[in-house]
Each structure stands twice: as structure tokens, then as C-alpha cells.
Amino acid sequence: RFCHGTKSMSDENLYRYLDANKQIKLDPEGYLVKQGDWDEGVADLLAKDEELTLTEEHWELIRVVRDFYARYEMAPAMRPLVKATKQALGEEKGRSVYLMSLFPGSPPKRLARIAGLPKPTNCL
């Protein structure tokens, strides 16, 4: 029989923890469960989890996506990310090639994850 209010064990097994103290919970795709858990130290741990070492260039882009999120309440997909980067950091850095060089694969997804934001809505 079905019991209301009980949590299935499999639901909990979908999550993992970023830190040894089990304070920072990640969803199955590696995004923070609680955005309030984010700080620069957490960003470093998330980057390490992605096998990245954050440089000042990475931090510039993290600030761009966090600012974008603060304004629009959503993480940017690639085209809005390129545009926001161009506006904030100039023509040279506002190019998808530059973003790919720092966040290979899917810059919007990797940046949102490391910046402690939800997954961009149109990223698979």
C-alpha cells in the first residue's frame, strides 16, 4: 500500500554531496540544490569537480552570468551569454570561441553550474 509523506530511498540516491561534511548537496546533473550554498569556495569545488582550475578570466565570466541571473532570473543560454559577455567585457571576450576555450563543451551549462545557478532552460 502507498504511504503519503514517506520519501523513497531512490530519490535520495539521485543526489550527491560536493564536500566531505555533506553540507553542499548537488542534484543528479551536478547543480546546487540550494543556491544559497554558493560562495567562491564552493565555486572552486564545483570547478574542480568539472576538472577546471579557475583563473581571473573564469571569474570574469562567473560574475557576468551571476549578474545576468540577478537581472533576468534565469541562467543565459549561449547566444544571450555571448551578448552579455560582449557588453560586460568587450568584443574580444564576447565570442563563443573565447567562452569555449575557458568552459569546453557547453559554456552555458558549465558556467551556470560553477556559478551556483540553475541549469539554463534550453540546454540539453
Where are these regions (language model features)?
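Short, Lys/Arg-enriched N-terminal segments with co-localized hydrophobic residues
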Residues: 1-8
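Structured beta-strand/loop patches that form or line metal/cofactor-binding pockets in enzymes
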Residues: 11
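N-terminal first-folded block
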Residues: 18-50
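Metallocofactor- and cofactor-centric catalytic cores in central/energy metabolism, strongly enriched
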Residues: 33, 43, 47-71, 78, ...
